[in-house]
Amino acid sequence: MAERINLVFHNKVLDGTAMKRLISRLIDHFGMAYTSHILDQVKTLGFQQATATSISLGIDDLLTIPSKGWLVQDAEQQSFVFEKYQHSGNVHAVEKLRQSIEIWYATSEYLRQEMHLNFRMTDPLNPVHIMSFSGARGNASQVHQLVGMRGLMSDPQGQMIDLPIQSNLREGLSLTEYIISCYGARKGVVDTAVRTSDAGYLTRRLVEVVQHIVVRRADCGTARGISVSPHNGMMPERIFIQTLIGRVLADDIYIGPRCIATRNQNIGVGLVNKLLNFRAQPISIRTPFTCRSTSWICRLCYGRSPTHGDLVELGEAVGIIAGQSIGEPGTQLTLRTFHTGGVFTGGTAEHVRAPSNGKIRFTEDLVHPTRTRHGYPAFFCSIYLYVTIQSQDILHHVKIPPKSFILVQNDQYVESEQVIAETRAGASTLNYKEKIRKHIYSDSGGEMHWSTNVYHAPEFTYGNVHLLSKTSHLWILLGEPCHSSLVSTSIHRDQDQMSAQSLSVKRRYTSKLSETNDEAKQKIASEDLIADYSDVNPSRCTDHYNLVYPAILPILDENSYFFSNCLSKRRRNQFIIPLQSIQEHKNQLMPCSSISMKIPPNANGIFCANSILAYFDDPRYRRNNSGSTKYGTLEMYSTIKKEDFIQYRGVNEFRLKSKVERFFFIPEEVHILPGSSSIMVRNQSLIGVDTQITLNLRSRVGGLVWVERKKNRIELKIFFGDIYFPGGADNLSRHSGVLIPPGTEIKTNYKESKKVKNWIYVQRITLSKKKFFFLVRPLVTYEIMDGIPLATLFPPDLLQQRENAQLRVVNYILHGNGKPIRGNYDASIQLVRTCLVFKRNQDKKSSYSEAARASVVEIRTNYLIRHFLRIDFVKAPISYIGKRYDPLGLGLLAEDWTHKNPYSKARIHQNLNQNKGTIHTFFNRNKGSQSLIILSSSNCSRMDPANGAKSNNVIQESKKEEYPMLQISNSLGPLGTYPPIANCDSFNRLLTHNQILVTNYFHLDNVKPPFQVFKFKYYFIAENLKICNYNPCSNLRLNAFYLNLNFLHPNSCAETSKIMSLGQFICQNVCIDKTRPPFKSGQVIFIQVDSVVIRLAKPYLATPGATVHGLYGETFFGGDTVVTFNYEKSRSGDITQGLPKVEQVLEVRSVDSISMNLEGRVEGWGKCITGILGIPWGFLIGAELTIVQSRISLVNKIQKVYRFQGVHIHNRHIEIIVRQITSKVLVSEDGMSNVFLPGELIGLLRAERMGRALEEPIHYRSVFLGITKASLNTQSFISEASFQETARVLSKAALGGRIDWLKGLKENVVLGGVIPAGTGFRGLVDPSKQYNKNNIPLKNNLFEGGMTDLLVHHRKLFDSFLNTLIYHHHRIDRFYNDS
């Protein structure tokens, strides 16, 4: 060894980082040869010490952590609490998954820290501790799996497994944990085998793209540069230093008047430190992006060589170095995944804690309420928020970073070290996210219910895709679904009670056709008679406005009803519109089907602003043949306002109401034929009337035949009109495609001309390139009449202005301008529709919601029925409403229905078990058949008063043995009532034996003495929600449209209590009253004076953006998909998740979803640029900025993957690759037919130079090719053919006569020539034309130098604009979102 000298002994541990610094300093001071000699001595010393120590590893050296037991127990307790939250509907499945993952990840990390402390305190010389924490062998993650806990695992797809492995490898795994562990181990093996080949193929493609990039000049003379700044808050200082070192300045740098660095100066460590200390201006540097060359690069734009620390030499193949620099780390990093065994290495959020006790205050205007990703309520701040904590005498200030969650309320008292805010995790974790779709499946069968927050997706008009507008619950009402094969033979109907176990039913009695299921709902019981209600006196009222007529709702088509011209009650917050009966329609002149009412079918009965409430189809605007409409030259509204839109068919399909007073219909005959039909007429031929077209089809008119063949059908059109050939019809050519008014004189040939008597339409028919003629087609003119007598159509009382709403009449054309209209033979086409539009007068101070809820209300006393349409403007109550897909179940009645008792005696026989249930029927539209669901007593919970309790209002759950059979109803009638469900057939029909009779849909004035039903008095519920005993002397006015019922004890009617609604949904553990135990989750289906029946239900919380499957009221079986969540998840912390992303970016595949507002953002960007610089400069600089920003974005995306793994690649290598895949443009117009063809790929610089040379703009758009496509679009066909698709490339090159100039390395290797790099480069360049190694070339000609300076001066003026904008928008990412 070398002779020792007296040096200072540094007693410090040399880890990997310290060793790197030592080697770097040794190279700087002593050089490469002497440094290698010193390192050999260090290696020899290490081997000697390791041999002397003789560390061995045994199973006794694996020391377990004593605190592991209570840590795991605490994590299990937190998971159990969160599971209860999910069952009660407080959090959804994704929030529970996130919370579970973070709980177990935090537990695992804490155990890892405890493991290190345990080793240091108990056995610091433990061999496991020495090896792992010194970095000699193994790492902390592996030792943690040996002595801590194996933790969360990833499956082979990289998805997280929710169930953690609580055991470690020292203790041994259970069978379940072993299977989960095999997932992670298999993931490591698969990644090691498969990903290595992927990384190798990625390296090959990268080298193919840039193999011809060689340094061929010293300076390209560019004046452009990329501006970077260390103090804009966007770039960390470490990355800023790595970006600058080795670059060349593109412009001088000044601090005040003093120049500290000049253009073309190499940036070293000293200059970077000087720039950081002086806080200089933004620095403009030269990069491969700014080089003006096309197929090579200059020394100054490339910068310093990484091998010897000086400017790169001429002839160096920097392209191949760049390709290997990116691809080779991926090959090496795939081997790391085997050692961690697929263990999840994610990240958790960071917390901000209170420094002391005190009251916290912050500005509430800067935050808004939200939910955390775990479902907790919090406040979200988008900018920096300053929080003050006032203790006794000290005022603490805490700065909360942007995009954080505030977990406490304003003016709340907090304790020291309490978590007050949650900040977003670091960029290394957050930026690596992927979008996941998680499906939630139903645990049991039942019936789907949802709230008004679920809306139909407008892009799927006829599908069953539903989305959520805000956070709400989905409910599966428990029941036992039966398959549709059993329904067809079943005699049971909706609300019948039957056995839940036996479906073999025989029925001896069949009701007459004049009796429908809703009027004759039978309670099936063994040998029991249905009670006869004929002796119950119906209530007759003397006042005209309260006469109750028998009426039903005839179904015209889906969701259409008759509209009445009778009464309309006016209230402050609602409309009440009576619906007309059949008998009332018989005495009117207008036909029954003329006016129809529309309840939105896909919006759960919600009328938004400008919704169509009713419509009238005028027979004058009806056609029986096909054609198209033309609005003529009359213009529509130029300014589109929000109130000019009409919501059509309940979905977000908005149509602009056009102010046209006249429109035209162009008739034509259209036949839609199957693709296999044999047509007996020729295309583009003339036929007469009644010509045989097919075997069983004849033409109704004569004219020109036009046949269009589409995918699976043939569209045959017959145009009738006059035909003029273009011999002298030059005048007609000017009128082609326009409407010609009467009185216009047109020339039909050279000599003749005629005046047009009626409106005509001139259409040009092209037979081939040189053959065409004109077809003059007749028009049918329609005038839109505003003078329709509204009193005969709609009730005049409805059209009056109200405080909160207004109904207005609007005429609009059903079909767009020029749109083809297809009609069937037996169906007519309606052109104009007169609509009654619902307009909401929204008050700014009003607390009502913008939308109104519509529901069909039925008022009945015994067999007297009346239907109303009710529109509420109040906010939606707690109860959920929605659409039932069993609309009305009512059939047409006989004329003598009013004289028949609806409840006649019947004897029904059925073998019943003790377990009774009630049937609910639904119409399954997808299958086209009915399905039923049986609600048995096991699915209900009954709450009764506690006997002997001190309080009268205490309710407890009854025991099952006391009530073996839950008797739901004691008399004829349905099982409870429902909330205001649109189009519901069973709406508030509750006939019971209780003291409270539900009559809250009834008006009474001057009623006769109290009528008795089974010797019980009627009790009414007034508007103040009190139960009132009837007084025959008083004029009682009831709240006819209020759903809420009081839940009172019979001995305490005067007391007030919580209001419960029929149909209301109650979550589990929600306390309605402090004196009562909490209810189970379910729906209130029956309310008595002394008890309430709740149908058990399972709530599913869903957040905005979730997709709801199925339809409202649809029957779900166990395991069916209920809802799908879209959420973001951090990627696993290994390169296997990053390498595919690098490949996606380099191949220009779509990584993230495109922003919904992308078009608007691009338009705003263009307006901003043109506003700053003016229109001519704006378009040019905007186009260049787009290319520059997209290149910077791609570089940043690729760098993030490798920096996350701790791999440092210089930006210049990635920039060379990105420069090649973004250097082509696509010619978009035939503006230069003599140079380029449309669709041709050319170089960007070539297009710019050609445009300047020819003084003619070239229309092109920039494209990202991807590395594979860029390898197949080079200047060398030999290089392309040796890559892939050899036959196609060579044949295409031979047909095109391509010439290969052998400028790249690969083509010279293939042909055995000297590669144009290294020493072979000097033979290609004339020595007299080579640049000197000086940075500034000499000026041989004064005039030439002056011209050059002049051009450079103008170029600098342009580039100064460009550099300024690039600096301001350096981090704008417009093409790809960071994942």
From Swiss-Prot:
GO biological process terms on file: DNA-templated transcription
Entry's Gene Ontology cellular component terms: DNA-directed RNA polymerase complex; mitochondrion; plastid
Cofactor(s) listed in the protein's UniProt record: Zn(2+)
Keyword Plastid part of the UniProt annotation: yes
Gene3D superfamilies cross-referenced by the UniProt entry: 1.10.132.30, 1.10.150.390, 1.10.1790.20, RNA polymerase Rpb1, domain 3
Lineage top rank: taxon: Eukaryota
Binding, Zn(2+): C220, C291, C298, C301
EC numbers for this chain: 2.7.7.6
Keyword annotations of the record: DNA-directed RNA polymerase, Metal-binding, Nucleotidyltransferase, Plastid, Transcription, Transferase, Zinc
GO MF annotations in UniProt: DNA binding; DNA-directed RNA polymerase activity; metal ion binding
Family listed: Belongs to the RNA polymerase beta' chain family. RpoC2 subfamily.
Purpose: DNA-dependent RNA polymerase catalyzes the transcription of DNA into RNA using the four ribonucleoside triphosphates as substrates.
Name the record gives this protein: DNA-directed RNA polymerase subunit beta''
